């Protein structure tokens, strides 16, 4: 049916083209067209109220399949406003552009009587001068709006062939003058303001309002649109995988860390430098995991994304600050105690006497707490745009307070471990490693330091790779916005550019595997088993002593009873 109408219109257009007056376009008559009142803007999304001629009393509409064409027009207008929102810094006279767009898709309507009891509703097209004003002040609109199409944007008016409906004057051509919204714009522009619309899932938040500015929203200039939280670097399913990984590993790792703390820090009577290092490392990892356990209890999204589109900050969200503090102290201490263990391994192999161990304790604790105080006092803890934890998100603060100093520590630890390996290689040339008690005692610490140092080296590589490509990730947001503007499924298939998923997944895996790693290396050792064995022996002895005391007391009481009974018998005999 549509093809027949188009062919008829095209033949008519060719017939009339030579005799068509200048400044006129040719319009197509739709028998289903009606002049109707504007259905109105939705409650939550203003569009064209106060921007239509006659206050929207006569809008050209068609009714088909129980759907008012105005509804479809509103959807098209909303998409146009979305595009206009993101090119607003390239345009002037933005409000007039929105007036024009409203009157293009919600055209004024004229009713004409062509025969007794026969009325025809015809659209009044936007004048070419108004169209030219729109694209001149906003050239990017010219990519979507072609003002040279005369039947959409006539200079004077539109001619409709109503001869089939009984109209005979002017050869059956009925003239409808074009509509210029300039007068309406001049009279009512003070009642309106430029309407920004953000394509889903972006949200609109006024950046000039203190309620929203600098509270964890990530704005997309030049708009007031903010990225969703969490940022859509990956699909929802992949984010769930990372979250589930964190939940499972953090819980297991926390339990393993507590076990090591009890085994080497509390139950162990005779504490050595290595048992202190193991306890300190396990406590550090437990702090990291404790932050995750808090998020599991409260809910990851409630902690990291307390409001739609807003990432948590320590100023407005105390739980974010708490989990960030636990994570920061934990991860700093893990690096420092790993380095401490590497230094002591090297000193043990080389028989070098170091300064007193308490200085390591003071430095490691002091640095972790000092860097925490600096970051917290500057309010630098917040949830990241692509992270499942709160931490330092300011680039220079994170580099100065963690990556640089801890990188130096890891370098020192790596040098120490490399030296230890070289020393072991030298020893292995002369004797079997199994015959060297000193080296055999250091095997497990060496393995743990190598694995932890290797894991942190991987984290460093990932971090600086993200930093190196950060500019590319930011510039790729343009492609993400274009995808949203052209999307028909609310942007479900659109994703921002970020780190590759697999390396990012492993990034979180390593940070939450340390507790399990230390348990496998130390928690299953004879030293750990002996600590618990001694505890069980103490409990058993204590229970035995208690039972014996109760038994003795019970025995003594029965003897007295027997003696009393015997005395009573003697009295009876007397």
From Swiss-Prot:
Disulfide bonds join 35-109, 48-102, 91-138, 127-178. One of its GO terms (cellular component) is membrane. Keywords: Disulfide bond, Glycoprotein, Membrane, Receptor, Signal, Transmembrane, Transmembrane helix. It comes from the Eukaryota. Residues 30-181 form the FZ domain. Residues 268-273, 346-358, 423-445, 524-574 are cytoplasmic. The keyword Transcription regulation does not apply. Residues 550-574 are annotated as: Disordered. CDD domains: CRD_FZ (cd07066). Residues 1-19 form the signal peptide. SUPFAM superfamilies: Family A G protein-coupled receptor-like (SSF81321). Glycans are attached at residues 119, 161, 187, 206, 233, 244, 486. It is found in: Membrane. It is a multi-pass membrane protein. Residues 20-246, 295-324, 380-401, 467-502 are extracellular. One of its GO terms (molecular function) is G protein-coupled receptor activity. InterPro entries: GPCR_2-like_7TM, GPCR_2_secretin-like, GPCR_Fz/Smo-like. One of its GO terms (biological process) is cell surface receptor signaling pathway. The chain crosses the membrane at residues 247-267, 274-294, 325-345, 359-379, 402-422, 446-466, 503-523. Belongs to the G-protein coupled receptor Fz/Smo family. This is Frizzled and smoothened-like protein G. It comes from Dictyostelium discoideum. The gene is fslG.
């Amino acid at each position: 049916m549509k093809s027949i109408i188009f062919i008829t219109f095209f033949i008519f257009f060719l017939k009339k083209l030579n005799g068509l007056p200048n400044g006129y376009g040719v319009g197509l008559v739709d028998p289903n067209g009606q002049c109707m009142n504007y259905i109105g803007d939705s409650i939550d999304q203003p569009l064209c109220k106060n921007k239509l001629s006659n206050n929207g009393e006569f809008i050209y509409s068609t009714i088909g399949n129980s759907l008012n064409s105005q509804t479809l027009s509103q959807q098209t207008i909303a998409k146009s406003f979305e595009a206009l929102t993101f090119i607003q810094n390239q345009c002037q006279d933005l409000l007039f552009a929105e007036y024009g767009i409203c009157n293009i898709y919600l055209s004024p309507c004229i009713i004409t009587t062509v025969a007794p009891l026969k009325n025809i509703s015809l659209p009044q097209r936007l004048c070419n001068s108004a169209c030219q004003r729109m694209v001149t002040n906003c050239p990017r609109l010219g990519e979507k709006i072609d003002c040279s199409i005369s039947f959409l944007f006539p200079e004077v008016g539109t001619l409709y062939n109503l001869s089939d409906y009984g109209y005979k004057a002017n050869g059956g051509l009925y003239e409808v003058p074009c509509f210029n919204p300039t007068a309406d714009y001049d009279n009512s522009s003070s009642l309106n303001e430029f309407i920004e619309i953000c394509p889903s899932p972006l949200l609109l938040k006024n950046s000039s309002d203190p309620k929203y500015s600098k509270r964890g929203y990530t704005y997309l200039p030049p708009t007031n649109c903010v990225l969703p939280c969490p940022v859509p670097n990956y699909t929802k399913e992949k984010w769930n995988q990372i979250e589930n990984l964190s939940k499972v590993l953090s819980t297991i790792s926390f339990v393993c860390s507590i076990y090591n703390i009890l085994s080497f820090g509390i139950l162990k009577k005779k504490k050595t430098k290595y048992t202190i290092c193991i306890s300190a490392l396990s406590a550090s990892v437990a702090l990291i995991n404790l932050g995750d356990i808090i998020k599991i209890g409260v809910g990851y999204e409630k902690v990291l994304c307390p409001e739609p589109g807003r990432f948590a900050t320590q100023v407005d969200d105390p739980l974010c600050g708490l989990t960030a503090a636990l994570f920061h102290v934990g991860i700093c201490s893990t690096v420092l105690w790993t380095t401490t263990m590497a230094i002591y391994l090297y000193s043990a192999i080389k028989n070098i006497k170091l300064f007193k161990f308490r200085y390591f304790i003071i430095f490691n604790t002091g640095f972790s707490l000092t860097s925490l105080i600096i970051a917290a006092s500057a309010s630098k803890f917040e949830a990241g745009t692509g992270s499942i934890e709160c931490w330092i998100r300011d680039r220079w603060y994170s580099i100065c307070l963690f990556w640089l100093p801890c990188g130096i520590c890891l370098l020192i630890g790596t040098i120490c471990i490399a030296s230890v390996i070289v020393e072991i290689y030298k020893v292995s040339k002369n004797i079997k490693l199994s015959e060297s008690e000193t080296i055999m005692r250091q095997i497990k610490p060496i393995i743990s330091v190598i694995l932890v140092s290797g894991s942190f080296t991987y984290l460093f590589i990932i971090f600086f790779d993200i930093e190196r490509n950060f500019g590319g990730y930011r510039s790729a947001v343009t492609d993400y916005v274009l995808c949203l503007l052209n999307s028909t499924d609310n942007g479900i298939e659109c994703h921002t550019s970020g780190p590759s998923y697999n390396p990012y997944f492993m990034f979180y895996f390593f940070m939450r595997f340390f507790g399990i790693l230390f348990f496998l290396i130390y928690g299953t050792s004879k030293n750990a088993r002996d600590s618990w064995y001694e505890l069980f022996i103490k409990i058993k002895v204590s229970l035995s002593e208690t039972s014996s005391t109760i038994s003795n007391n019970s025995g003594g009481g029965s003897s007295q009873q027997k003696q009393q009974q015997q005395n009573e018998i003697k009295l009876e005999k007397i």
